[in-house]
């Protein structure tokens, strides 16, 4: 981080000021790494929240709705939030002692949700300051996932907001915050392709871009039986059908691995398949970042050995195979240590499963931010063949 000026600036703002920050940047620029560094090394009392259960689990945080006990209905500015039930004494203490609120995947957070958070924090802290005086670290890419707004919600919210995006929050508009955009991509080295991706991302596609991409179009492209291509599809059903069909064609013994859950872990927040059926020869994708850097979220490989107790995956152009161990994800909630007055994470439950999924196909939505060596995009029933594809 010391060598990256943008990350260093972000760290200084978080650690040495009370100014709120919107940290953005395309996939692969270090947003997740920065979040991990803040959690490990910052001296501030913090909590991490995210708009969805899966995003919260991946960030080792909790959902916005669960922590702030928000109702499912939209929030109308200048009204009072009515929590689903009364805040516990400890929850109130956490909010009163909080220094830093980290919101991951901020692009998915609606403006009214941010205003609801503001209303709650003002109630328990400094009433005249936005968000009760709490510093915000908002992390996300506005050009990836967007807020989910139902038609009836949009009709109501349009009376108060120009857009449903978080930056239209009344509270945020009255807050002085800085925007830091990370620009160096660490997962993609092809400069020509980076430029094309950025043109698509920013809506500035040129004729030259299309000419380069069209050279990759192969109408009758067949990836071959043992290739590591992955189909990017529009719907789960299509991806599941491709994966099931490909797995069935492998004439090897199938092994079923059931996840182990302990304590409280909501089913809609499961980070992996509860039942995982695999065979030797199956193409798989890692769905977790390995701390020892043997694999990363989105890395593709093929199972070269499997039994009831062991899975070995070999990745393209790598001599050393990976013996995969089950990964444990935690469902946490925040508590206040009465003695130290520090905010601590309490593990409510765990989910343990091999960090793998079948990977002949995946939906475009689930592939956000992942890096693939080879991909086939199903676009309007035509196949577009790309190398070194990183979806933005």
Where are these regions (language model features)?
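Conserved ATP-binding/catalytic motifs of P-loop helicase motor domains
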Residues: 1-391
């Amino acid at each position: 981080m010391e060598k990256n000026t943008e990350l260093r600036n972000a760290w200084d703002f978080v650690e040495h000021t009370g100014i709120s920050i919107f940290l953005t940047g395309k996939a692969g620029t270090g947003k997740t790494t920065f979040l991990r560094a803040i959690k490990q090394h910052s001296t501030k009392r913090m909590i991490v929240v995210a708009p969805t259960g899966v995003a919260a689990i991946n960030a080792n945080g909790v959902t916005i709705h669960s922590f702030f006990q928000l109702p499912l209905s939209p929030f109308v500015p200048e009204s009072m939030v009515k929590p689903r039930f009364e805040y516990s004494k400890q929850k109130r203490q956490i909010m009163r002692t909080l220094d830093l609120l980290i919101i991951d995947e901020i692009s998915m957070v609606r403006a009214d949700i941010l205003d609801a958070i503001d209303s709650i924090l003002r109630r328990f802290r400094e009433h005249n300051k936005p968000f009760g005086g709490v510093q915000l670290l908002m992390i996300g890419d506005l050009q990836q996932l967007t807020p989910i707004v139902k038609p009836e919600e949009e009709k109501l919210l349009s009376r108060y907001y120009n857009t449903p995006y978080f930056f239209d929050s009344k509270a945020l508009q009255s807050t002085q915050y800085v925007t830091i955009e990370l620009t160096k991509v660490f997962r993609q080295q092809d400069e020509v392709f980076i430029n094309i991706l950025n043109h698509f991302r920013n809506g500035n596609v040129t004729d030259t871009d299309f000419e380069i991409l069209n050279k990759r179009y192969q109408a009758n492209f067949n990836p071959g039986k043992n290739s590591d291509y992955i189909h990017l599809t529009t719907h789960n059903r299509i991806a599941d059908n491709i994966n099931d069909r490909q797995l069935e064609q492998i004439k090897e013994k199938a092994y079923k691995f059931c996840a182990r859950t302990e304590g409280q872990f909501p089913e809609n927040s499961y980070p992996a398949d509860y039942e995982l059926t695999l065979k030797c020869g199956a193409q798989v994708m890692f769905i977790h970042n390995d701390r020892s850097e043997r694999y990363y979220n989105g890395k593709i490989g093929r199972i070269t050995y499997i039994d009831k107790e062991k899975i070995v995956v070999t990745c393209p152009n790598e001599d050393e195979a990976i013996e995969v161990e089950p990964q444990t994800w935690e469902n946490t909630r925040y508590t206040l240590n009465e003695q130290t007055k520090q905010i601590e994470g309490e593990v409510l439950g765990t989910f343990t499963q091999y960090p793998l999924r079948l990977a002949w196909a995946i939906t475009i939505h689930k592939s956000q931010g992942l890096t693939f060596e080879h991909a086939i995009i199903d676009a309007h029933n035509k196949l577009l063949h790309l190398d070194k594809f990183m979806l933005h």
